[in-house]
Amino acid sequence: MLTYKNILIAVDGSHEAEWAFNKAVDVAKRNDAKLTIVNIIDSRTYSSYEVYDAQFTEKSRSFSEELLKGYQEVATRAGVTNVETRLEFGSPKAIIPKKLASELGVDLIMCGTSGLNAVERFIVGSVSEAIVRHAPCDVLVVRTEEIPEDFQPEVATPEFRKQYS
């Protein structure tokens, strides 16, 4: 029987990512696997600022650290016994499949589909698409078009996101 022992889940604070996170917790529990929860602060977002804004960077870092802490608590409470978090800066399209997958020795990467529309996906491509194309391991992309209407995030709640907007 195929089992996964080292799972990476990419989260960004969206409903889609939290939906995928919940599924990653289930897969990690069923396989008694290590779960690494990753958030990438996309450094490309800084390019729109003419002057590097330290306050923006600190707010992004605080958001990511609290997000990862919340997800780690949820995974541990759900019964995942080996949970780690990683915060990185750069392009998620490169860091997740090309750097972290090998560096952490993961055998499964899980992620949600992006919130991009068809035009945005055509122009910039999606993170999940880049992961599928470049990852050296299995990838499970959680389809998020059918998130139940009553789905309520436990970590990336509207109140949580509002603190950092």
UniProtKB/Swiss-Prot annotation:
Matches recorded under InterPro entries: Rossmann-like_a/b/a_fold (IPR014729), Universal_stress_UspA (IPR006015), UspA (IPR006016)
Record key words, sorted: Cytoplasm
GO cellular component: cytoplasm
The protein, known as: Putative universal stress protein SH1215
Major site of localization recorded for this protein: cytoplasm
Gene3D superfamilies: HUPs
Transmembrane spans: none
Family matches, as Pfam families: Usp
Source organism of this protein record: Staphylococcus haemolyticus (strain JCSC1435)
Family classification: Belongs to the universal stress protein A family.
Cellular location(s): Cytoplasm
Cytoplasm listed as a keyword: yes
Intrachain disulfide bonds: none
